Amino acid sequence: MERVLGIGGHFIRAADPAALSAWYRDCLGLDADENGLWRQEAGPTVFATFESETDYFGSRSQQTMLNFRVRDLDAMLAQLRVNGADVADETQDMEGVGRFGWVTDPAGTRVELWQPA
């Protein structure tokens, strides 16, 4: 059986794609090239499904949630706050999995940040 090799991309609709790309670059350090190519560091990737009634993604109208691995969750959340980002007050610790925090991008999309255990 053929298998997928990994996530090949994540595509986001935006009223102002250039401004949203700049936010991801300036606030999260996602330095994609002019074609959108970004080379991520090696590490685990989670693929999970959720019940349709979940509130975990924030708004129920949001059908998927992007999760970025980070080295230091506290430092990333502080950096986002300094940049004026909409950062959730709470974080979550899951034993053996890691720590989680959330930011909402300028387009209103909730993004999860994960510091693996």
Please place each PLM-identified region on the residue numbering.
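Conserved short beta-strand elements that form part of the metal-binding/catalytic scaffold
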Residues: 28-63, 103-106, 110-116
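Vicinal oxygen chelate
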Residues: 1-6, 12, 78-117
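Short alpha-helical
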Residues: 18-19, 74-75, 98
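Short linear motifs in intrinsically disordered
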Residues: 27-31, 67-69, 90-93
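Mid-chain, well-packed structural core segment of small domains
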Residues: 59-85
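Core segments of cupin and vicinal oxygen chelate
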Residues: 1-7, 11-48
